[in-house]
Amino acid sequence: VSSYPGDFEYIDHTIAMEHVMNAEEQKILETVDSLRDDIIDFTLRLVAQPSTLGQEEGAVQVMEEELQRLGFTTTAIPLDNKALAEHPGFAPTPWQTGTRKNIIGRRPAQAEGGKSALFNGHLDVVNAGSPELWSNYPFSPHIHDGWLYGRGAGDMKSGVAAMTYSVHALDKAGFGLCAPVTVEAVIEEECSGNGALACIAAGYEAEAVLIPEPFGPTILTDQVGVLWFKVSLSGKPTHVLEAPSGVNAIEKCYPLFTALRSLEARLNETNVPEAYKDMDHPLNLNIGMIEGGDWPSTVPSEASFHARLSYFPGTDYTTICNIIESTITKCAQQDPWLRHNMPRVEFYGFRSDGHSLSRDLPALTTLDQCHMSLTGKQAESYISTCTTDLRAFHWYTNSQPTCYGPIAENIHGIDERVNLESVMQVARTYALFLARWCKLYQ
């Protein structure tokens, strides 16, 4: 399953050079291509780090060492939930932050006259599921037929490598920039967004923000809102020989699943923004985890499930929370047991409102022009049915943010992989963007 809506075209960049405006830009692109092995090697080293929730330290260390080796000035930004708690974008989480951190690399401006840029990418990855279902161990990355396989290969460590080396390419080609550039590698993108938020709270922003999410060489203009929630239920335990006298908490989840599915259907049909009207089912409910019971021969007294639900731009987090709580309450009131033992709803993790962007923003226009210089045609718009860290920059900074990234398949699934030529396309486009947006200095 690919995240990219189109067909990727392998571009002959000797022909594409005809669209590039000057010799300086041609030299930059040639330098990017000379760094192909470095970009792939960096991706392999990042993917080899199993940076699931709470285990990101290895990947962060690899990132920090690479930035320092390439001459960036680095700063660690701790993920401190207590310090972030008062921020309107903060997402409460039940897990501890400990000493976990994000890492920032900076290249200062060498002159004035350009506009600042920030590249953001996340180092955390989702769990690999059942490793035995993979062709190879998920954190032993390998390359086959132009694709790099491994958990996080597409989502989104290859993009992190591409954005890092796009900045380095200008330095290697002998060019400075007339505005500062920030490379930002964060954690908790997959669950809360607090990593990117911590960097924003620390003062890191720019006039343009590019995120190489694996949606292909497209320009993201719209994304849905997303939230997580947990529903806990109580039953009445008993030995199975007297099962009818007990109340099975796990089975009491079933009508709630049905009610939430009905809510999902209603949300997909109500106040649909123009960008989503041609989509068959843009909003999705996922019952992602279920827990309950402690013995096969005991009617379970407790059960809970965790879910993710998306909602359209224009609906805010508080409103959708109220709708979910109302849906659960109305369903429970129809059950003789649940109406006296109401399910408990807890919201945690993502509280991410959706948003829409104009393609006419100068940063998006410049990015599109760079894409056209390399491909000869305009980049497609991407209408996202998931959330990204883009939302934090949209809501809490004055940046012009979007996503433009490589082509990946099976993200969050088995045998996740990324197309390596598309990774190089990202690096070329980003380097060209820096030259035009930040302006060259030599």
Language-model regions, residue ranges each:
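Short glycine/proline-enriched loop/turn "hinge" motifs that connect secondary-structure elements
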Residues: 133, 176, 220-226, 296-300, ...
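Short Gly/Pro-enriched turn/cap motifs at secondary-structure boundaries
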Residues: 93-97, 220-223, 276-279, 381-383
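Acidic/histidine-rich catalytic neighborhood of metal-dependent amide-processing enzymes
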Residues: 148, 156-228, 438, 442
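N-terminal amphipathic/basic-hydrophobic helices that include classical n-h-c signal peptides
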Residues: 1-19
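Short, conserved micro-motifs enriched in small and acidic residues
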Residues: 148-161, 186, 247-251, 417-424
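Acidic-glycine-rich active-site phosphate/pyrophosphate-binding loop
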Residues: 128-143, 221-232, 370, 402
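Acidic/His- and Gly-rich active-site-bordering loop/insert found
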Residues: 18-148, 177
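Metal-dependent amide/peptide-bond hydrolase catalytic core
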Residues: 18-27, 34, 69, 230-442
